[in-house]
C-alpha cells in the first residue's frame, strides 16, 4: 500500500534548523534547510547523513523547497549543496531568492571573518548554491517531474514567505513553514484554499499562546520606549534585517511624528537601504494599504530613523537602536548589548522568539550574569522586556489554518514538546484527525488511500487515438475529461457527453479587460482600424470583422465603445474564455500599446 513518510532532521520538538524529509508516493522532498542559532559546533546543521544512506544524494532527493529567508530555515543550504553534495533543484519564491544570499553572507562574515570558525561555507559556495534555485510564483503549479508538482501559497510572516503544497497523483502534503494568520502594518495574512491534503505539516512555535490585542501590545511598546528615553536611557531592539524591523520602524516613525520627539532612532547601517530596495521591488507581497499608498508615499522611507554608526553606542543621552541579529547571538546587537547592559536606565526589548542557547533566550529566562567569550562575566542591570511582535501564528491562528485546509492528518514541527502536546490534543479533539509530533530522526508513516479504478468512455479514448499518440506503458499520459460517479463507480467522459447524460446546459466563463485609447474617430471606424491592425499582426490566427462592428480572434471578442466622460477617448472591451487566456493577455498588451497611425 502506498504511504507518506515524514522524518524531521531538524525542528522536530525543537525550534531551529528546520529541515523535514518527506517521502510521498516514491518521491523524496526536503522541506527547508536551516541552521540552529544556539550552536556553533556540529549541532548547528541538521543531520544530513539520513539522506545519504541510500547512496548519491541527488539521486535520492527529487527537490529541496525553502519556505522563507530566515536562517533557521535556509542557513544550511550552501553547506548542504556545496559541501554535502546536493546538485538537484531548489525551489523558493523570488523575494526569498533575492534576500537569502545577503543574509547568508552576513552570517558567514560573523562566523568566519570575526569568530574564525572552520568547516563553514564560503562566499563562492553561496553564489554556486543560488545558481541551483528555481523561483516560484504564488499559486503557480510547478511540475518538478512527470508526477511531482508543487504550489506556493502566501504565508505572511516575512516578505516572500510561502506555504507549499507537494502533490503526487491524488496524495498531497502541505508544509506551512512559518506563517501569520493576522495581517500587520506591512504584510497580509496567510491564506490557503480548502485543498484537503493527506497531511498538513504546520509550525507550532506559539502552540499554547493566544495573543492579546495587537493595539494594546503596540501601546505598551510605545509607552516603554517613551518612558526610557524621557529618563535619559537608551533602548536596544534586537531584530532580524527584514520583517519585525519594518513593522516596529513604521510604528515608532508614526509615534515620533505625532509626539514631536527629538531622541534619535537608529537602524543597523546598510540594512534600511537594503530593506527599502526589496520592499520596493516586491511591493505585491506587502499588504493592501502599502500597495495602495506606495505611489504617493513610500512607507519605508523614514524621516526619523537614521543609519547607525558604531561610535554612536558610546554617545551620551537617550536613543533608540534597532540592531541585528534578533536573538543577541552575534553581530551588532550583541556588541551594543554588552556596552549598555550595565546601566539600569537602559532597556532591551526582545520583540520575537529566541532559541535556546542564545543570549536573548538566557536574559528572557531571567539570567542576569552571563558568561561571554573568554570566560568574561557580564552583569545585566538594564531592564529586559519581552513583547511578542513575532510574526508566527498563535494557537488560534494554527487552529484556523487547520480548519481552512481540512487535512486528513496533521503533523507539528518547529515548537517545544510540552506545548506541542497540548496543541496536538486540541487538534485531535476539535477536528477528529490524527495529529503527530515526531522528534528529530523519528519517522512517522501514514498509509494513504489506494488508487480508485476509473472507467474511460470509448468516445474519449477514440478522440485520444485520433490524435495519433500511441500508448506508452513507461510514460503515463493525461486524459482530460469530466469525472462522473454513479452507483459508487467512476467514469471519465468527454464534457459534451457529461452535459448530455446529466441534462445540463453548458455555461461559459469569459474574462473582460478594458483598454483606453485616445481616438476621436467614431466607434465603427475605430473597430475597422483594430481589425486591420490585428489582421496584419496575427497572421496565424483567424481574425474576423463581424457585421455588428465587433472583431473576433479565435474565441476572443473585441468591441469598441465611447468613453462615458471623455469624448476624445475610446474604450476597447477585450473578452476571452480561459482556453484562450494566453492569447487574450497577449492581445490586451498589444492593444494597450496603441494602434498604428493611419497612412
Swiss-Prot record:
Place the motif Nuclear localization signal on the sequence: 469-479
Q: What is its EC number?
A: 3.1.27.-
Required cofactor names:
Zn(2+)
Record SMART domains: Beta-Casp, Lactamase_B
Top-level class of the enzyme under EC nomenclature: hydrolase
Q: Which InterPro entries match?
A: Beta_Casp (IPR022712), INTS11-like_MBL-fold (IPR041897), IntS11_C (IPR048662), MBL (IPR050698), Metallo-B-lactamas (IPR001279), RibonucZ/Hydroxyglut_hydro (IPR036866), RMMBL (IPR011108)
Cite the binding residues for Zn(2+) 1: 68, 70, 157, 178
UniProt record similarity statement? Belongs to the metallo-beta-lactamase superfamily. RNA-metabolizing metallo-beta-lactamase-like family. INTS11 subfamily.
How the protein assembles, per its UniProt entry?
Component of the Integrator complex, composed of core subunits INTS1, INTS2, INTS3, INTS4, INTS5, INTS6, INTS7, INTS8, INTS9/RC74, INTS10, INTS11/CPSF3L, INTS12, INTS13, INTS14 and INTS15. The core complex associates with protein phosphatase 2A subunits PPP2CA and PPP2R1A, to form the Integrator-PP2A (INTAC) complex. INTS11 is part of the RNA endonuclease subcomplex, composed of INTS4, INTS9, INTS11 and inositol hexakisphosphate (InsP6). Interacts with WDR73; interaction is required for the assembly of the RNA endonuclease subcomplex in the cytoplasm.
Name of the protein in its database record: Integrator complex subunit 11
Amino acid at each position: 500500500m502506498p504511504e507518506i513518510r515524514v522524518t524531521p532532521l531538524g525542528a522536530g520538538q525543537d525550534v531551529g534548523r528546520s529541515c523535514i524529509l518527506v517521502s510521498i508516493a516514491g518521491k523524496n522532498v526536503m522541506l527547508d534547510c536551516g541552521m540552529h542559532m544556539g550552536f556553533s559546533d556540529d549541532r548547528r546543521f541538521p543531520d544530513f547523513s539520513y539522506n545519504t544512506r541510500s547512496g548519491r544524494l541527488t539521486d535520492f532527493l527529487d527537490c529541496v523547497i525553502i519556505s522563507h529567508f530566515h536562517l533557521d530555515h535556509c542557513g544550511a543550504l550552501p553547506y548542504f549543496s556545496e559541501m554535502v553534495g546536493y546538485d538537484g533543484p531548489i525551489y523558493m519564491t523570488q523575494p526569498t531568492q533575492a534576500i537569502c544570499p545577503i543574509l547568508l553572507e552576513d552570517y558567514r562574515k560573523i562566523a568566519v571573518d570575526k569568530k574564525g570558525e572552520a568547516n563553514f561555507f564560503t562566499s563562492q559556495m553561496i553564489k554556486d548554491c543560488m545558481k541551483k534555485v528555481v523561483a516560484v510564483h504564488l499559486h503557480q503549479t510547478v511540475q518538478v517531474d512527470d508526477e511531482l508538482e508543487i504550489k506556493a501559497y502566501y504565508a505572511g510572516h516575512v516578505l516572500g514567505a510561502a506555504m507549499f503544497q507537494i502533490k503526487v497523483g491524488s496524495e498531497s502534503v502541505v508544509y506551512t513553514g512559518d506563517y501569520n494568520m493576522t495581517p500587520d502594518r506591512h504584510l497580509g495574512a496567510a491564506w490557503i484554499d480548502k485543498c484537503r491534503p493527506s497531511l498538513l505539516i504546520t509550525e507550532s512555535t506559539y502552540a499554547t499562546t493566544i495573543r492579546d490585542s495587537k493595539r494594546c501590545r503596540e501601546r505598551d511598546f510605545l509607552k516603554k520606549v517613551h518612558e526610557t528615553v524621557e529618563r535619559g536611557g537608551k533602548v536596544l531592539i534586537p531584530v532580524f534585517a527584514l520583517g519585525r524591523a519594518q513593522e516596529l520602524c513604521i510604528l515608532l516613525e508614526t509615534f515620533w511624528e505625532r509626539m514631536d520627539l527629538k531622541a534619535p532612532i537608529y537602524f543597523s547601517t546598510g540594512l534600511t537601504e537594503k530593506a527599502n530596495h526589496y520592499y520596493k521591488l516586491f511591493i505585491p507581497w506587502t499588504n493592501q494599504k502599502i500597495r495602495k499608498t506606495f505611489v504617493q508615499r513610500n512607507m519605508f522611507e523614514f524621516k526619523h530613523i537614521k543609519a547607525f554608526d558604531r561610535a554612536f553606542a558610546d554617545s551620551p543621552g537617550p536613543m533608540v537602536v534597532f540592531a541585528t541579529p534578533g536573538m543577541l547571538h552575534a553581530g551588532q546587537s550583541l556588541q551594543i548589548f554588552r556596552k549598555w547592559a550595565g546601566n539600569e536606565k537602559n532597556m532591551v526589548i526582545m520583540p520575537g522568539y529566541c532559541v535556546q542557547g542564545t543570549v536573548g533566550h538566557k536574559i528572557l529566562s531571567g539570567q542576569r550574569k552571563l558568561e561571554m567569550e573568554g570566560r568574561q562575566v557580564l552583569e545585566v542591570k538594564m531592564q529586559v522586556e519581552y513583547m511578542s511582535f513575532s510574526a508566527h501564528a498563535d494557537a488560534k491562528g494554527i487552529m484556523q489554518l487547520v480548519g481552512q485546509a481540512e487535512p486528513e492528518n496533521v503533523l507539528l514541527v518547529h515548537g517545544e514538546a510540552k506545548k506541542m502536546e497540548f496543541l496536538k490534543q486540541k487538534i485531535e479533539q476539535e477536528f477528529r484527525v490524527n495529529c503527530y509530533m515526531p522528534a528529530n530522526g523519528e519517522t512517522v508513516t501514514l498509509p494513504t488511500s489506494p488508487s480508485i479504478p476509473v472507467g474511460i468512455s470509448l468516445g474519449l479514448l477514440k478522440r485520444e487515438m485520433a490524435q495519433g499518440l500511441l500508448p506508452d506503458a513507461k510514460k503515463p499520459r493525461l486524459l482530460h475529461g469530466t469525472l462522473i460517479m454513479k452507483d459508487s463507480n467512476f467514469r471519465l467522459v468527454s464534457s459534451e457527453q457529461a452535459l448530455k447524460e446529466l441534462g445540463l446546459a453548458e455555461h461559459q466563463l469569459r474574462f473582460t479587460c478594458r483598454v483606453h485609447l485616445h481616438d476621436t474617430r467614431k466607434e465603427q471606424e475605430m473597430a475597422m482600424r483594430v481589425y486591420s491592425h490585428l489582421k496584419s499582426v496575427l497572421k496565424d490566427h483567424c481574425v474576423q470583422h463581424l457585421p455588428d462592428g465587433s472583431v473576433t480572434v479565435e474565441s476572443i471578442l473585441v468591441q469598441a465603445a465611447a468613453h462615458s466622460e471623455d469624448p476624445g477617448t475610446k474604450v476597447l472591451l477585450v473578452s476571452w474564455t480561459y482556453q484562450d487566456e494566453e492569447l487574450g493577455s497577449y492581445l490586451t498588451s498589444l492593444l494597450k500599446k496603441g494602434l498604428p497611425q493611419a497612412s
